């Protein structure tokens, strides 16, 4: 459970600030385009003067956008395909939950816990600091907290 005040703070304040700051950085280099996923998948391609701003704020935007997209008022189950992949990777849904909970609760300071598809196409639980995104590590996030 996440209370309404915390949700409001993250949606209307934090996320909006990430969007505003990412847009301000992108305005300095219109030649690189606005595809944050592509840019953050290859951070070395981002001009040095805006690189950290895009890592921080672009990552914050993408992380929160996925978080909002996945949020539902009702409890939902993973698709049959994802459930099978979770069982194959972790042994059971309960073992996945334990790994995901550990990734979330052992993150020192602020950050995210993730279920990602790694470069080898396999599921993996990982954690990133602050607003770092697994996209920058060549991973596709499918669940984030």
Swiss-Prot record:
Keywords: Iron, Manganese, Metal-binding, Oxidoreductase. GO terms for cellular component: cytoplasm. Pfam families: Sod_Fe_C (PF02777), Sod_Fe_N (PF00081). Its EC number is 1.15.1.1. Its cofactor is Mn(2+); Fe(3+). It catalyses: 2 superoxide + 2 H(+) = H2O2 + O2. The keyword Oxidoreductase applies. Changing residue 95 to D: In strain: NEM1126. It comes from the Bacteria. Residues 126-145 are annotated as: Disordered. Binds 1 Mn(2+) or Fe(3+) ion per subunit. Destroys superoxide anion radicals which are normally produced within the cells and which are toxic to biological systems. Catalyzes the dismutation of superoxide anion radicals into O2 and H2O2 by successive reduction and oxidation of the transition metal ion at the active site. Belongs to the iron/manganese superoxide dismutase family. PANTHER family: 37S RIBOSOMAL PROTEIN S26, MITOCHONDRIAL, SMALL RIBOSOMAL SUBUNIT PROTEIN MS42. This is Superoxide dismutase [Mn/Fe]. It comes from Streptococcus mitis. The gene is sodA.
